Amino acid sequence: MGMIKVIKMDLHGYHPSEIVQTDVLKKIIQQTWEMGENCVTLIHGHGRNRGISPGFVNTNTGYFGLEIRRALRHDKELRQWISYTTLDCSDMGVTRVKLKPNPAPTRSELDHDLLPEMKLGRRSW
């Protein structure tokens, strides 16, 4: 059996509008698959330091995590790379999904400019 290869992507400090509502999440998944990885772990935070908000009471994440999970479950374009039924939401602030096998990986690393530039200070979204 081959080694299980997992990419971990820390998305702390980003807003869903920068990752989920753009093509960044798609690029993360696609490039990870192109590397021949087996799984991608998206670290988005659990949103607990903001108190209990309506809609988050029975979840182990906040708004960002829910948006990521919604995209992974429902974006049909992502299904060419992921096994969406393998979505793992068991850890607080983290979402994992298994990738479909790639018999011929074409890249060795993620693009260095994959994530948008971090903005300092208050954002205007």
Protein language model regions, located:
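Long, charged, low-complexity intrinsically disordered regions
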Residues: M1-W125
